[in-house]
UniProtKB/Swiss-Prot annotation:
This is CRIB domain-containing protein RIC4. GO terms for biological process: cellulose microfibril organization; establishment of vesicle localization; pollen tube growth; regulation of actin filament polymerization; regulation of exocytosis. It is found in: Cell membrane. The gene is RIC4. The lineage of its organism: Eukaryota, Viridiplantae, Streptophyta, Embryophyta, Tracheophyta. Its main location: membrane.
Amino acid sequence: MRDRMERLVVLPFSIGCISVSSVAVLSPLSKPHHHHSRQVIREQEEEDNMKNVFKFLAVSKPEISIGINRIFKSFKTISQLFADKDEEKEEVETSGMEIGVPTNVKHVSHIGWESGLTAATGPGKGWEDLIPPELLAAAASKKEINPHLHPTL
């Protein structure tokens, strides 16, 4: 229970948009040094003492932003927990197919040359259709036909 109590963060009513990387635009003006009476000096000392007391009670800005980020993350994780359970139930109900089990899926298309190359013609057959007839005629006229390209000539 103590672990949970340490995680609670008290949020102030107004949160500014000051971050660690912000830069002050104006610097505080220095007060002119005048001769102060003893009463004014005592009042300033009392104010300084009160400021020191409130410094212990105040939460620094990086700690506030860390607390807010933790709260947002906890909301996200809670919503993800509920969303995952709903999706898992739907997947179990709708999917009747398991990975790795043979199915009755048929192969309907081939990648690559489709014109004369099919499994029925076998390997090495149908390559003649890939060579344009103009090149075959030019090669036949010069009698420089490669026997591997056109074995019938």
